[in-house]
């Protein structure tokens, strides 16, 4: 099993959810592109080993995974929002947050990986996304702040922070292929965020 990323899709020119065959543009001259390009290369290496040596390989492409298992060093926006909410702080956003994302609770992601591993077709890739949790970054932050009764604030980002941003305006994934294998998400976004904040707070 190879765990890839939704970032391999790049920027596509059409609207709608990303299917497993929707590959868009990635700027090769952006240092930020080292991540999605390396993931694409690793996927190709997997299927090359399948062809050359008959390796049984399945690829999964998780969306934005969140949950109480995040570390203090996790710098992703969703992790920062959950951390700030668990400390009952106002949540600070460094952008308008209008980018659309596929969120999925870490426990749902774990079951999705097992389903793909045990039932998936060799050489195929499967998106991991809860179709009930496709929202903007701002909407995710709003749920976090409202759950703990704090404010959502906005600040201008530094140039260094901007350089690390995922440039995909939409990375909403279609999980139909995975669902056809019998998987479905069990955590809706509100309850998943609430559970995550409560668990993180227990460790503080």
Give the location of each predicted region.
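Mid/C-terminal beta-alpha module of Rossmann-like enzyme folds, strongest
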Residues: 119-162
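Conserved loop-to-helix N-cap of the C-terminal "lid" that shapes the substrate pocket in Rossmann-like
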Residues: 59, 74-79, 97, 102-110, ...
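Conserved C-terminal active-site "lid" loop/helix of NAD(P)H-dependent oxidoreductases
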Residues: 106, 125, 138-139, 161-185, ...
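Conserved Rossmann-fold NAD(P)-dependent oxidoreductase catalytic core, especially the SDR/UDP-sugar
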Residues: 1-32
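Glycine/proline-rich active-site loop of Rossmann-fold NAD(P)-dependent oxidoreductases
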Residues: 40, 66-80, 89, 94, ...
């Amino acid at each position: 099993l190879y765990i890839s990323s939704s970032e391999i899709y790049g920027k596509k020119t059409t609207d709608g959810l990303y299917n497993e065959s929707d590959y868009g543009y990635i700027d090769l001259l952006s240092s930020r592109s080292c991540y999605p390009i390396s993931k694409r290369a690793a996927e190709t290496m997997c299927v090359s080993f399948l062809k050359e040596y008959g390796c049984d390989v399945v690829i999964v492409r998780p969306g934005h995974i969140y949950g109480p298992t995040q570390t203090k060093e996790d710098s992703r926006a969703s992790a920062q929002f959950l951390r700030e909410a668990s400390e009952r702080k106002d949540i600070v956003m460094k952008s308008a947050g209008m980018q659309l994302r596929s969120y999925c609770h870490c426990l749902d992601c774990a079951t999705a990986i097992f389903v793909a591993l045990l039932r998936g077709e060799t050489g195929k890739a499967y998106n991991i996304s809860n179709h009930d949790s496709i929202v903007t970054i701002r909407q995710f932050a709003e749920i976090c702040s409202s759950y703990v009764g704090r404010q959502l604030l906005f600040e201008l980002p530094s140039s260094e922070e901007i350089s690390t941003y995922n440039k995909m305006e939409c990375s909403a994934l279609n999980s139909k292929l995975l669902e056809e294998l019998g998987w479905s998400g069990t955590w809706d976004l509100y309850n998943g965020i609430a559970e995550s904040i409560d668990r993180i707070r227990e460790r503080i």
